[in-house]
Amino acid sequence: MDQDIKTVIQYPVGATEFDIPFDYLSRKFVRVSLVSDDNRRLLSNITEYRYVSKTRVKLLVETTGFDRVEIRRFTSASERIVDFSDGSVLRASDLNVSQIQSAHIAEEARDAALMAMPQDDAGNLDARNRRIVRLAPGIAGTDAVNKDQLDTTLGEAGGILSDMKDLEGEIHDYIEKFADDTALVRGVAWVYNLGSADGGETVITINKSTRTYAVPYIEVNGSRQEVGYHYSFDLETQQITLATPLKAGDFVMVMTTESQLPVETLLASSVGAASIGTATGETVEERLTRLYGHFVHPETYGAVGDGITDDRVALQRSLDVAYENALNGTGPSTVRWSGDYMVSLNPNSLGVSGELAAGRSALCIRPGVSIEGKGTVRLDPSFTGSQSGAVITNWAGPADDCSIKDIRIYGGKDVATGTGITGILILDSQRVVISDVKVLNSTAGGIYLRKGATEGLYGCSFSKVSGCTVDNAGYIGIQMERPYDNTVIGNTINRCEDNGIDVFGNVNDATVTGIAQSTLITGNNIRDVLNGVFIESCGNTNITGNYIADFRSSGVIYNRINSAANDNSLTSNVLIGASGASAGVSFKNSVGYCTVASNRIQNSDYGIRCVGGGITGLNILPNTMKNIAKTLLFVEARNNGLVKSRMSTQFYEGAQVGGIPSNTSPRGVPHRFPSRLSYIVDIQPFWATEQGTREDNFERAKGTLASITGWGSKCALYDTIVAGDTVVSLNSSSVAVGEYLEINAEVYKVTSVSATYAVVRKWTGSDYTAGDYAAVIISNPSYIIRRVQWGEQ
């Protein structure tokens, strides 16, 4: 009988590296344990030992209390390395691996049987010079006795054993249960039909009191049969289906794997998760470690997550632990919020001058910390007051490399008694990422990246707000103060009482362009706000590809407080106003140097609006406009309202009716801010899709004054038809009172008309004055008629 143990080896302690003398298919089939006569400890790979090479391991733990190191191969009988499917290609290498796995299982089963208590060649149980421990006292005459029984018997007999009874045993099973190193799974040999088959059987039912979980192999008359080739095993029916029927008298031994403990007890134990495999080949315990070992969970620190209990302290603790880990490199720096957490304002939160009032914020994020998960943070609506604060902020200082992803924040608007609490406010930080966050019902702003109290020109730098939703905010949706290389992309902003997106860079004591660099605002969907995007006293922004609808004032506005809003670009946006909206684009208070191109502007009084004077350097390339109630390009009635600018031909969907919408505000009106558009302003007429005159600068009509025979073949008379006034050869069917005539580069105002003439008075520098102008209105000059609005707007 072969007594060579091949799959288990023990070494004395003292060294740190030990050889693996057997081959194996996977490292998870190799178990390293520390053992002694009365104790055993199974070690974990990576944390308690590691592989130096394929055939050598190194211990990483102390061996105190143990005298041996055991290395054992334990190949899974249920987790196949190779799984064959119908129709697949059969490769020799796969067959070899499958065959090796079966062979390994068989070797391990044989070794386990030998190590448990095998039979010798005479059929006797052989303890192999080892103690049999935990032996119950014998009862029947053929039972073995333990040492206590023997000592008692010897004592009662005065220490003299006069007679020894021969121990006789009858073996009823082919082999007893044997244990692996976890003492949970037992391999048992079972003999079919008392060792003699009836003949013809193709199905064998294992009828044992304990449940069989696998059949690694069977032997028929000593010939080994492999699972998957010679037979299959059904766990539910406990039946073995044979490929070849048995013959009468065949001796069939079945090697089974069964549980000593109930499955429920096994799975509920500390090693239960490690006993369950997954489709990826890892155990449930390994999967949980991989998923949750990378996160800090507030539930660890007492968070309830029911949306009612105040979890602020637990959430803050999770943030603090993540920061300590990030700082020391000792653990996960990502916090996973997956519950529904109520948080109150922290009375100990610090204030930041001009940004946060003390005691008005809930949670503080620190550098290197990430927040993610599908969780919800609800601000306790019982707060009062109106001072500024935030649900999540960084009152302790810059929070470089922080991120907030995929959570919801409810601010309590419409139910809270207080106001002023923004959803997220990050100050003076670099590489901030806020993505897929929903800020709902904020009593102030949604998501802010701002300049705090620290030194330096800029607020947050190299940062991004993407894929977020801000809905029903009491103030601004997304705001950046003094940004540097920041991006706002793909966000949805709805129902803000102020601006959808706001960029602020004012410098109080400067008149140059405000502070902002490389700001990209793109792909955002903004609806039902006061202004869609507000660029306040700063430049270097690129606003492109946004959809802005239902704004109440302007789709995009550029404004100066102290420093200018220059050097900007506005392209390819859709700007659709709500009823009564002022303008698609507004420029206010000496700003400019902006390219406006390829935008769709719709449903507002003005397409582009310039107010406050000094609007400079606008490059208005073709845009599409529709439903503009008054003017495509409005310039406020003041000198130098728009200078050094140009407007290309605009595409207007619709018709101009009665000169409305006008192409621009009146240009060149001598009596009303003649330099309203000045210093090289080039304006091209617009183009309309519907029939109409497509007037430019309120030019209603033009022609040549006709000579009248009754006037001596003249086209103008003085003091003849109307005393003290000049009349021209136009009548009430061609010109109206209040309209203006341009004749020979002079401007005249029509003061009255009849069926045969029109009375005109000339602009003389201070007023339209009656006088003799017939002497210069000669030789049938050409004329231009401009509408009344030309002189009044």
Curated annotation (Swiss-Prot):
Source organism per UniProt: Klebsiella phage SH-KP152226
Family as reported in the entry's similarity comment: In the N-terminal section; belongs to the Teseptimavirus fiber family.
pH dependence: Optimum pH is 6.0.
Subunit structure: Homotrimer.
Name of this protein: Depolymerase, capsule K47-specific
Temperature dependence: Optimum temperature is 25 degrees Celsius.
Source species, domain of life: Viruses
Main location group: virion
Localization annotation: Virion
Domain remark from Swiss-Prot or TrEMBL: The N-terminus anchors the RBP to the virion. The central part and C-terminus probably binds and degrades the host exopolysaccharides.
Any matching Pfam family: Beta_helix
Function text: Functions as a receptor binding protein (RBP) and probably mediates the attachment to the host capsular exopolysaccharides. Displays a depolymerase activity that specifically degrades the K47-type polysaccharides of Klebsiella pneumoniae capsule, which allows the phage to reach the host cell membrane and bind the entry receptor.
GO terms for cellular component: virus tail
